[in-house]
């Protein structure tokens, strides 16, 4: 009996020692192994939540479209119902953002950049539910927004959540897990692991602290999120455009011309985004009722637009293969391009929870395809394929607007599985970036972050001025 008791006590002591060792390992902030393990956890969680977000948005969209199909034969019901359903869904997203987590509005990528510099708060307990449910509303309503921005912000906030749950106190761990979550989020949104890594290194280069531990953590998180994505969605490219032909050397100058066009379009697009943001701010003045009603009106209009021309509504992933295949005329491509520019400005600049990556990729595809079709008519001797210009255009607008050409190139190649077009992609994106920089254009996300920080400083200064007055009272 005594032997059994002593054996049991010995086993208990061993278990307690193991638990103590694991706890100490997790609490040693400078242990690379602990950070890498946490990065794997962050990547896995981000992949799971990213897939869940994608499925949830698709479910809401299918439910909305299914309700419209039921009344498709009754025009007097169809049009009002399309407006009302999309308006109500959009209002849910706008209300949640404005009421509970204003930092969850828009793409969320500038918020992650600010958090990496310790300039913006990371309230993951608010942002995660608001961004997820709010994004279901706005994206499910058919608004011209993408899911990549929300997934990046969700990933970054999951990184901070894991840090807080495991009580890792070091600044290095805090910074690394936030960046890891953001990279894993982009990878989970686009099934583009290398683009997720490059996005952190290139787009967030002023904020990202590049060292051996941080880059290994980012790699680990991205690998895990990509594995999770492929378990649920398979390994096929996220955008199916088929295998396109190579670009002959004697046609490469046309891609430089296309890059020059996007180099002009990019700064203009950024300027329009910022001006539209100012217009909306003047309209609602921060008043929640006006803001929600405005969002509902925009969502309802997107619902109506989806009936008139489905290609002009939604994030754009369904539009890209159709446009790249040359199924539209040049005139219709330009019409859809202009329409989607307007709807992108209205949806994104109004502060709806949703990203701008996917809409920009769709815009680049439309303009690139139109250019390719026109070039095929003007230069029949080249036997040009418009789809190759569509692929080049996808990354070019992003390169000119966000000022991340390498990310744009790799992202598009991973999404379409057309790696043979890497040379024309480089020429187009480099030309677009250089001209945009020469024209004085500023990177979109950095500019939005600067405006957010200026507003934050102004609000803090106002509070400091009011504090003495309140004390005297």
Swiss-Prot record:
Motif (Selectivity filter part_3): 355-359
Sequence motif: Selectivity filter part_1, positions: 106-110
Alphabetical UniProt keywords: Antiport, Cell inner membrane, Cell membrane, Chloride, Ion transport, Membrane, Transmembrane, Transmembrane helix, Transport
Taxonomic superkingdom: Bacteria
Chain ranges inside the bilayer that never cross it: 109-116, 177-189, 190-192, 193-201, 387-401, 402-404, 405-416, 417-421
Compartment annotation: Cell inner membrane
Residues that hold chloride according to the record: 107, 356-357, 445
A GO CC annotation given for this chain: plasma membrane
Membrane topology: Multi-pass membrane protein
Site residues, Mediates proton transfer from the protein to the inner aqueous phase: 203
UniProt keyword annotation of Membrane present: yes
Assembly and oligomerization: Homodimer.
Matches recorded under HAMAP family: CLC_ClcA
Protein family according to the UniProt entry: Belongs to the chloride channel (TC 2.A.49) family. ClcA subfamily.
Name of the protein in question: H(+)/Cl(-) exchange transporter ClcA
Species name: Salmonella typhimurium (strain LT2 / SGSC1412 / ATCC 700720)
């Amino acid at each position: 009996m005594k032997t059994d008791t002593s054996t049991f006590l010995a086993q208990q002591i061993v278990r307690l020692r193991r638990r103590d060792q694991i706890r100490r390992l997790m609490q040693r902030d400078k242990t690379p192994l602990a950070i890498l393990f946490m990065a794997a956890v962050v990547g896995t969680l981000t992949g799971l939540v990213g897939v869940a977000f994608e499925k949830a948005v698709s479910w809401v969209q299918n439910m909305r479209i299914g309700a419209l199909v039921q009344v498709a034969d009754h025009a007097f019901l169809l049009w009002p119902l399309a407006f009302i359903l999309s308006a109500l869904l959009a209002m849910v997203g706008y209300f949640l953002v404005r009421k509970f987590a204003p930092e969850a509005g828009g793409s969320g990528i500038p918020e992650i950049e600010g958090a990496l510099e310790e300039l913006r708060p990371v309230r993951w307990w608010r942002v995660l539910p608001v961004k997820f449910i709010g994004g279901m509303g706005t994206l499910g309503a058919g608004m011209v927004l993408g899911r990549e921005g929300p997934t990046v912000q969700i990933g970054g906030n999951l990184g901070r959540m894991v840090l807080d749950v495991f009580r890792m106190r070091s600044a290095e761990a805090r910074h690394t897990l936030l960046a890891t979550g953001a990279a894993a989020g982009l990878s989970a949104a686009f099934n583009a692991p290398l683009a997720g890594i490059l996005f952190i290194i290139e787009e967030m280069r002023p904020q990202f602290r590049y060292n051996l531990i941080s880059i290994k953590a980012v790699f680990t998180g991205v690998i895990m999120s990509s594995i999770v994505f492929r378990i649920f969605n398979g390994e096929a490219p996220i955008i199916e455009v088929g295998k396109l032909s190579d670009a002959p050397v004697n046609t490469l100058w046309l891609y430089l011309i296309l890059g020059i066009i996007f180099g002009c379009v990019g700064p203009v697009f950024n300027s329009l985004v910022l001006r539209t943001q100012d217009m909306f701010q003047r309209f609602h003045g921060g008043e929640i009722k006006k803001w929600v009603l405005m969002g509902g009106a925009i969502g309802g209009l997107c619902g109506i637009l989806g009936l008139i021309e489905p290609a002009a509504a939604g994030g754009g992933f369904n539009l890209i293969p159709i446009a790249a295949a040359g199924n539209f005329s040049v005139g219709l491509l330009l019409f859809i391009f202009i329409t989607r520019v307007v709807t992108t400005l209205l949806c994104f600049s109004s502060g709806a929870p949703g990203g701008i990556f996917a809409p920009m990729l769709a815009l680049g595809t439309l303009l690139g395809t139109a250019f390719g079709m026109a070039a095929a008519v003007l230069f029949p001797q080249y036997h040009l394929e418009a789809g190759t210009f569509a692929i080049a255009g996808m990354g070019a607008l992003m390169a000119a607007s966000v000022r991340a050409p390498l990310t744009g190139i790799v992202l598009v190649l991973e999404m379409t599985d057309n790696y043979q077009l890497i040379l024309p992609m480089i020429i187009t994106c480099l030309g677009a970036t250089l001209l945009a920089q020469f024209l004085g254009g500023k990177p979109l996300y950095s500019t939005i972050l600067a405006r957010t920080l200026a507003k934050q400083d102004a609000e803090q200064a106002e509070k400091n001025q009011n504090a003495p007055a309140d004390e005297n009272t």
